[in-house]
């Protein structure tokens, strides 16, 4: 089996690319970073530090790389069985034209073996969004052929991969946590379902997408925002602060109550999942900076994201949300000189006041009780 993976960054190399290569799949990375491409093509291998209770170093080998702009990547798309991405949500639109060209070439060459495409991004139904961009880039006469022969498979991904300060300055070395979860929608594949260790198949993807968003992402963000306010440097420092831990755990329990009501998750298993995530935040090997995790607060405070979406669920089912409100208030306080969204947030609050600003960012009704609760919590933190 042959695969092409867009994005040879830390997540591409440390998570998805590693799982594919470990499964014995012939893997080529596509990227724009020439330093990384040259290193991959010189060595065809790299090291991954897997850190948890213990630390181990795995070697990923037998990999190649091509530029994601140019003819080589188009040629590969015409040949491979699987295309995956870890490029970040905003970059999906930029790689769509190359994917479209590759599919046209595939059709011209008469290659009717199924191709499956899986976007492994921190977003809901990212592959469906990528499909929209690809379809827009396709000529009309290729669209029906692509619908028939190409599967666009949505997925949920979860593995903490912090930017690694490599002691050796090796551009390929990467550190990842032991935990990893890659869940894909088995109803969207064309052809036989792949057997890749570390990839889980489900016919109820949205339950797992929301479980991750409402637990890991919600907890991670609130840990970062409360940690930054309290003067902590890393996620580990913040979660070891008992006051912060109580709010983070409480918020994950509140969002968890929504999941249990909505999808019928087992309450005991979900409580264990929350404990596992708290343990991941404590990982001493992951130097996960609160400022990195907190960046882009406008996106994180938007209606469909990790803070407001679970809050809306608590309103829908009439459930408590005191700790989620604390997290939202802390997010409104997030300041970072390196993050344009943090600066925009500060300017918006200074200009309109916290009530109107939160309503504008989140889509919540400015006069609602929940916005008033958030503003009260926000002011109490000043």
From Swiss-Prot:
Entry keywords, A to Z: Acetylation, NAD, Oxidoreductase
InterPro entries named among the record's database cross-references: 6-PGluconate_DH-like_C_sf (IPR008927), 6PGD_dom2 (IPR013328), Mannitol_1_phos_5_DH (IPR023028), Mannitol_DH (IPR000669), Mannitol_DH_C (IPR013118), Mannitol_DH_CS (IPR023027), Mannitol_DH_N (IPR013131), NAD(P)-bd_dom_sf (IPR036291)
Gene Ontology annotations for the cellular component aspect, listed alphabetically: cytosol
Class of enzymatic activity (EC top level): oxidoreductase
Gene Ontology BP terms: mannitol catabolic process
Ligand binding (NAD(+)): 3-14
Gene3D superfamilies given in the database record: N-(1-d-carboxylethyl)-l-norvaline Dehydrogenase, domain 2 (1.10.1040.10), NAD(P)-binding Rossmann-like Domain (3.40.50.720)
Reaction it catalyzes: D-mannitol 1-phosphate + NAD(+) = beta-D-fructose 6-phosphate + NADH + H(+)
Keyword Ion transport: no
Keyword Acetylation: yes
GO molecular-function terms, A-Z: mannitol-1-phosphate 5-dehydrogenase activity
Modified residues (N6-acetyllysine): 269
Protein EC: 1.1.1.17
Family statement: Belongs to the mannitol dehydrogenase family.
NCBIfam families noted in UniProt: PRK02318.1-2, PRK02318.1-3, PRK02318.1-4, PRK02318.2-2, PRK02318.2-5
Subunit structure: Monomer.
Protein name: Mannitol-1-phosphate 5-dehydrogenase
Lineage start: Bacteria, Pseudomonadati, Pseudomonadota, Gammaproteobacteria, Enterobacterales
Gene: mtlD
């Amino acid at each position: 089996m042959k695969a092409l993976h867009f994005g040879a960054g830390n997540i591409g190399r440390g998570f998805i690319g590693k799982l594919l290569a470990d499964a014995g799949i012939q893997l080529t990375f596509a990227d724009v970073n020439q330093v990384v491409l040259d290193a991959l093509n010189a060595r065809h291998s790299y090291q991954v530090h897997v850190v948890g209770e213990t630390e181990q170093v795995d070697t990923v080998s037998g990999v190649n790389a091509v530029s994601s702009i140019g003819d080589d990547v188009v040629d590969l798309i015409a040949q491979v069985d699987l295309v995956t991405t870890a490029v970040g949500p905003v970059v999906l639109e930029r790689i769509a034209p190359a994917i479209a060209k590759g599919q046209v070439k595939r059709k011209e060459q008469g290659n009717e073996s199924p191709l499956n495409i899986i976007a492994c991004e921190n977003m809901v139904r990212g592959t469906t969004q990528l499909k929209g961009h690809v379809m827009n880039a396709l000529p009309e006469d290729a669209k029906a052929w692509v619908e028939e022969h190409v599967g666009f498979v949505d997925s949920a991904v979860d593995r903490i991969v912090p930017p690694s300060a490599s002691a050796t300055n090796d551009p390929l070395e990467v550190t990842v946590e032991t935990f990893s979860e890659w869940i894909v929608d088995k109803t969207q594949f064309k052809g036989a379902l792949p057997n890749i260790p570390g990839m889980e198949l489900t016919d109820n993807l949205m339950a797992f997408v929301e479980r991750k968003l409402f637990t890991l992402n919600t907890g991670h963000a609130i840990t970062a925002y409360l940690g930054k306010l309290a003067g902590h440097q890393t996620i580990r420092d913040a979660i070891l602060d008992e006051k912060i831990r109580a709010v983070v755990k409480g918020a994950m329990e509140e969002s968890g109550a929504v999941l249990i009501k909505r999808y019928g998750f087992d309450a005991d298993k979900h409580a264990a999942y929350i404990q596992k995530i708290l343990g991941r935040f404590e990982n001493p090997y992951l130097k996960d900076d609160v400022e990195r995790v907190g960046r882009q607060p406008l996106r994180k405070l938007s209606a469909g994201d990790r803070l407001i979406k679970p809050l809306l669920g608590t309103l829908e089912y009439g459930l408590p949300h005191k700790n989620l409100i604390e997290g939202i208030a802390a997010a409104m306080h997030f300041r970072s000189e390196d993050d344009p969204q943090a600066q925009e947030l500060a300017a918006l609050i200074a200009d309109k006041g916290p009530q109107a600003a939160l309503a504008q960012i989140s889509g919540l009704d400015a006069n609602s009780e929940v916005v008033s609760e958030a503003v009260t919590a926000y002011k109490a933190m000043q």
